[in-house]
Amino acid sequence: MIFLVRNSLLSLALPMGALMAVEDEFKDRVQPFLKTYCISCHGPEKQKGKIRLDDLAASMNDQKEAEIWSRTLESIAFAEMPSDKAKKFPTKEEARFVQGWIARTLEQAGLAVEEKGDKEGYGNLVSHELLFSPVESKRAIDVAARLWRVSPQALANTVRGARIVSNPFALDKPHGNFRDFKGKYTFNSLMAEQVTELALAHSEKEAKNARKMIVLLRKRGSAIDEANQEAIKRHYHNVLRRSPTENEMNALMALLKKVDAELGVPRGLQAVYAAIILQPETLFRFEGTGDADESGLVALSRRELAISLSFALTDLPPDTNMLRAFENEEMTPRDILLAETRRLLDDEKRPVARKRLLQFFQEYFDYEKAEDVFKDQIKGHKHWAPALVYDLNALVMHTLEKDKQVLKTLLTTREYLVYVNSHRDHGNPLVYNLPPDWKPTPKPVRFPKDQRMGVLTHPAWLVAHSGNFDNDPIRRGLWIRYKLLGSSVPDVPINVDAKLPDEPTWTLRKRMHVTREDECYKCHSKMNPLGMPFERYDHYGRFRFNELDKPVDVTSKLVNTGVPEVDGEVNGPFELIERMANSTRCEQVFVRYVFRFFLGRNETLGDAKTLQEAHKAYLDADGSMEA
């Protein structure tokens, strides 16, 4: 499979390509790279995976060689090559140059280059080193305008009063990514039919209410057209937060009169109200409707900024106060953004912005899916996942209230909040290994330093990243690889039977030895070592010393993770967590995920300045999310 982020890697390679011919680059830089890092496993004496690289030519006209080059490109991009067993590893700059050279040469040969960096789940393919490089902070933002559906809550608010059995804009579960992302959801014919039915039901009720106002205006001397226009203006403000243009008003009045003539009053007003709801502007979020500057960039209008900020922090369209604030020409858009963000975060009566922060952590740590992981009830322990999720929600909110070193606290805290009533009813204190005589308390419960540490050892997270009947170190390691280390793992090939042997007398570590086969371990080497330390807990999230009457092995060795301070031998989950919590790289990766959640897209190199400023603000404010 040939893939690459054309905008990032090719932009790095093209300036060099203007100075050196492809053959010279191949001879001077690509061949030495292959010889140093690849030929020992893919040369004349050994061909792992039946791949040989020492006899490749710079030309990509041969189809078989082009396929090998594309596989090499993928392996370097996902840091599969060289393997973790290698003695030498290339620098990031060396790897980027070879990636750029392969991508450019493939394209010159007329081969398609699939762009993945803009797709959901592939944001880590954009170079982390470049995103946080001072040189890249001067690059202009180079992203396409976003277009995506409004949130389910926004649709429900728009058609309030209509009975919604199933919201057609319902979001998928995160599955490791974020639920709402630009371009993630299509708008199909079934969805259009459902939205139309909701719009008609809502408009029928609203039109009847509007008739009362129209009758009142008529009694005060208004002409029928004036009264109808006033009703349309009010509904426009309620739904779209603006007044209709002259052309829009003329079209809607024509529709009203036509339907009234054919079906009678107030069917015309009902049709107009439904038409307002069914406008693309009501159902989708648009950007970039203004004029481009001399460099081709389009700045968001003040109204677009208001809509973007409101959806980012509340998942709803902007309220009247926000729209009025952005109409203030005496303030710059940046100052208004800061002021309105502060207003929403400080709003105690409607703490929607704080709930939105909770939603980010729910999707980032992906622990709500614990409720979807079926577990057998076993003697002496009654599993109740919703209460565990509630506990972790409470811990996140408790941390956000303090708003100091938020990520580090969530990764390393020894204090958990245990929801008393539900756990007393369902027996969940046992999952925390609390003693039988434990006295419930609304205060945080402090655990011994050798038993629990932060979210990654919380029962809710452990259950969410487990199977129905066993632990899943692969899934846990994959989460760490993506969400904290900021790297990637290739998609599972369609011909792979991802299944462990069913041997009830073997420990999970022993059963996982099948993943050490050469064709498997190039990917599993990036997940298994990160997930194995969490074998300290069973798949219910209970702390343990033994597995199948054998001492549980929680040691691991991390090699070439991309984060040097994380590499090395680890003796358990706490040592691994502390290394990641103290890593600047992991903190920067966290900032990248915050960016993706609130902007609804992956970052590009043009966002380097924004990300660097966001990370600096986080540091300067002592790890504050509000900063």
Name these PLM-found stretches:
Residues N247, R285, L297-A306, S310-Q359, ...:
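Extended, well-ordered alpha-helical scaffold/bundle regions in very large, multi-domain proteins
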Residues F97-W101, L111-E114, G121, L125-A227, ...:
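Extended surface/linker regions that mediate inter-domain or inter-protein docking
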Residues R267-L269, P280, T320, A353, ...:
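Loop/turn elements at helix/coil->beta-strand transitions in domains of secreted/extracellular proteins
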Residues M20-L216, H237-N238, R242-A254, K258-E262, ...:
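Aromatic- and Gly/Pro-enriched helix-to-coil junctions and flexible linker segments
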Residues S11-A21:
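Hydrophobic h-region of N-terminal signal peptides that target proteins for export
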